[in-house]
């Protein structure tokens, strides 16, 4: 286990998957990252490459050949190489194996750098195509899971709210085999007066989505086309608990 700490946060990362295992707010001792309880989900914050999500029949086709790639790729199941650590950052890297070339026909190098800056954790991913002779098709993503302050095991009560930065319009959803369906669906906005007023005046930054069973009736909220720039997680009293920002063109909230 590798650790990085400043005055506000303590980060722990495992070599397996270069996955965050813990992120503690040192002001109150609160654990921010989900603890990997297998009764719900045994992950914490895996990195996804060379695909995010799944493929139809687990197969991609290129130049007349078929390749079997597991859901979310394969780097989350491997041990990464520790590269270096500084006062405020830690870096890991992974390169393809010969066996992986049977699943994904490009030699690659993937690096992740975690940086602590005051009360912010920054994650940077760098992908290198090592083939030097053909363009590499890939997806890369992060899958962080956060502890909810007001979550209850039965899941029946609203555990908090989501507030979006950007211009959220509508959603995609996963269908058969976890692949995206073509139809677009409405965002499950809260029915409270604050949100109804915000939507009426197109003030999307004041509109909230409840975190509850009904919100995730179709498993996930999938925003494409750079609709979302950041998401705030609020507790039941609408106090900000965490903020996640990314330049990724697609967000999936699960």
Predicted regions and their residues:
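Beta-strand-rich N-terminal accessory domains
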Residues: 1-62, 66-69, 226-247
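Active-site/ligand-binding surface loops and adjacent short beta/alpha elements
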Residues: 137, 145-249
């Amino acid at each position: 286990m590798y650790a990085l700490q400043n005055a506000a946060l303590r980060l722990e990362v495992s070599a397996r998957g270069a996955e965050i295992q813990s992120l503690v707010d040192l002001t109150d001792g609160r654990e921010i990252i989900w603890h990997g309880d297998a009764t719900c989900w045994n992950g914490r914050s895996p990195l996804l490459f060379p695909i995010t999500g799944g493929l139809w029949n687990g197969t991609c086709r290129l130049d007349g050949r078929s390749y079997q790639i597991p859901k979310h790729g394969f780097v989350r199941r491997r041990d990464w190489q520790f590269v270096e650590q500084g006062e405020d950052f830690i870096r890991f890297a992974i390169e393809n194996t010969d066996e992986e070339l049977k699943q994904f026909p490009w030699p690659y190098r993937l690096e992740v750098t975690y940086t602590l800056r005051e009360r912010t954790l920054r994650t940077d991913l760098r992908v290198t195509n090592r083939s030097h002779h053909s363009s590499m098709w890939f997806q890369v993503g992060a899958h962080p899971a956060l502890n909810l302050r007001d979550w209850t095991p039965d899941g029946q009560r609203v555990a908090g709210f989501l507030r979006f930065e950007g211009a959220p319009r509508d959603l995609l959803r996963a269908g058969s085999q976890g692949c995206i369906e073509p139809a677009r669906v409405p965002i499950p906005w809260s029915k409270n007066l604050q949100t109804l007023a915000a939507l009426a005046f197109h003030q999307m930054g004041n509109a909230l989505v409840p975190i509850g069973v009904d919100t995730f009736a179709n498993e996930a909220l999938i925003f494409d086309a750079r609709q979302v720039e950041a998401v705030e997680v609020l507790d039941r009293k609408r106090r900000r608990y965490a903020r996640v920002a990314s330049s990724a063109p697609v967000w999936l909230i699960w």
